[in-house]
């Protein structure tokens, strides 16, 4: 009898539980023999993505002609106003611009494949602030001459034949005419603005010197958006766009960008919404802005979807005041900007030792560096590494009210003497603290005093710093791949 009561009690409890879980308006029914069981749809398996095969410099998918297993190539290109227009810059996958001596800037175009470069130049001497950016990637580095600091880096890191010191069999174009109608043949243009090289000469250098161009890259230069997803990162929807730090909004307008490298050298970008790219311009000694063009590509204007600006301390190397050789601090990182699609986003960057790769990060809400790598949209990039002293002059705005016709400052390169090269100078030689016999492996230093270089009159003397650059060379580090 007790068992029967327990069974009845259990049945009543189950009925109450079912009634309590029943949603309003639901009815509980018992399936009959004629009822059809509900169909359960299988969850589709996630689509398997193909292997990630991205161009190391742009993040774009590799094409059929991608130079698999080949080193990237970097070339030093003159950017003093008298050297413009340049050749080959439109072929660059990444274009670096950094201040060198006298307040002028220099370019370092970086190419995925040297065989597609065509003609490039005017080629100029190597500087360590550029070399340290490509050292982790073990790029072929092409220049004409080098500073003593650059020479020492090549020795310390055993760069050997990857440090080419003669413009890769460079040649002189004595008849080239610059933007102002001046030429060496007419006696109105310095020899330094006449050195060029090309794909064939680079190939001949590699072949004749048995340069090892084999290199497998296991990561891309930046943390690019995955091309396989078919998406683009909209900076307006950035994870940082919801807050402002003490310096203002993290994401703001960037249709117009103006970067001040020194009192005499500026670069600006104008956003073209129809092409989703930035057009590049620079200021000239006559007070005008002009498009930055590639005269080897029918004066094609340089454009970039990605514009990256990195601020850091730049000062004269102690003991090199006469030449005003510039030291760029990479050890500590700093604030920068990533501009894309007419917007500019504040970021944090780090590098560290020469063997560590450049890294970009989102900011935390307190303005400090986060641990989240910045996603860069695929495509070509312009990268400026510029003096933090000019950070407050960085302009990023809408195009409303921007005067696109004239410059706000002039360049003063007329008061700056780069080199005192002679017409009979051996190709590849330079008065940048080296003799014509220097090969980049460090055998020779000059026995004669280098040509005196002056800073622009309106800029004043370069700031001196008695603190020697920190030793950045861990003995057990190997280059990143």
What does each of the following model-derived ranges do?
Residues 30-49, 426, 435-441, 446-461, ...:
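Ser/Thr-rich, Proline-interspersed low-complexity disordered segments
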Residues 22-24:
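Bacterial signal peptide processing site
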């Amino acid at each position: 009898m007790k068992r029967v009561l327990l069974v009845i009690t259990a049945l009543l409890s189950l009925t109450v539980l079912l009634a309590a879980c029943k949603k309003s308006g639901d009815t509980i029914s018992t399936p009959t023999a004629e009822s059809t069981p509900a169909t359960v749809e299988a969850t589709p398996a996630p689509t398997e993505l193909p292997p990630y095969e991205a161009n190391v410099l742009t993040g774009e998918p590799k094409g059929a002609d991608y130079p698999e297993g080949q080193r990237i190539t970097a070339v030093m290109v003159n950017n003093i106003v008298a050297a413009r227009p340049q050749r080959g810059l439109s072929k660059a996958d990444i274009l670096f611009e950094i201040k060198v001596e006298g307040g002028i800037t220099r370019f370092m175009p970086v190419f995925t494949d040297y065989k597609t470069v065509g003609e490039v130049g005017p080629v100029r001497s190597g500087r360590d602030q550029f070399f340290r950016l490509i050292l982790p990637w073990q790029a072929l580095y092409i220049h004409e001459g080098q500073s003593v600091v650059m020479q020492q880096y090549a020795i310390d890191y055993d760069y050997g034949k990857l440090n080419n010191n003669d413009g890769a069999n460079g040649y002189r174009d004595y008849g080239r005419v610059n933007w102002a109608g001046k030429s060496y043949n007419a006696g109105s243009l310095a020899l330094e603005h006449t050195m060029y090289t090309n794909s064939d000469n680079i190939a001949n250098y590699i072949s004749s010197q048995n340069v090892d161009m084999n290199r497998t890259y296991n990561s891309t230069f930046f943390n690019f958006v995955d091309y396989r997803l078919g998406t683009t990162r909209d900076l307006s929807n950035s994870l940082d766009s919801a807050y402002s730090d003490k310096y203002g909004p993290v994401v703001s307008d960037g249709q117009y960008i103006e970067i001040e490298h020194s009192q005499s050298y500026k670069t600006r970008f104008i956003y073209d919404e129809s092409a989703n790219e930035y057009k590049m311009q620079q200021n000239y000694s006559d007070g005008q802005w002009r498009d930055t063009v590639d005269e080897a590509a029918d004066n094609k204007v340089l454009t970039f979807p990605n514009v990256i600006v990195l601020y850091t301390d730049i000062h004269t190397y102690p003991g090199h005041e006469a030449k005003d050789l510039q030291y760029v601090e990479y050890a500590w990182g700093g604030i920068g900007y990533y501009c894309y699609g007419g917007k500019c986003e504040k970021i944090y960057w780090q590098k560290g030792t020469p063997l560590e790769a450049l890294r970009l990060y989102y900011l935390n809400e307190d303005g400090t560096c986060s641990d989240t790598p910045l996603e860069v949209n695929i495509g070509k990039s312009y990268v400026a590494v510029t003096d933090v002293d000019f950070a407050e002059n960085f302009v990023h705005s809408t195009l409303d009210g921007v005067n696109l016709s004239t410059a706000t400052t002039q360049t003063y390169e007329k008061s700056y003497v780069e080199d005192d090269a002679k017409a009979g100078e051996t190709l590849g030689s330079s008065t940048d603290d080296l003799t014509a016999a220097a090969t980049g492996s460090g055998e020779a230093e000059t026995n004669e005093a280098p040509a005196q270089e002056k800073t622009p009159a309106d800029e004043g003397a370069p700031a001196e710093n008695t603190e020697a650059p920190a030793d950045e060379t861990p003995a057990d580090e190997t280059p990143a791949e």
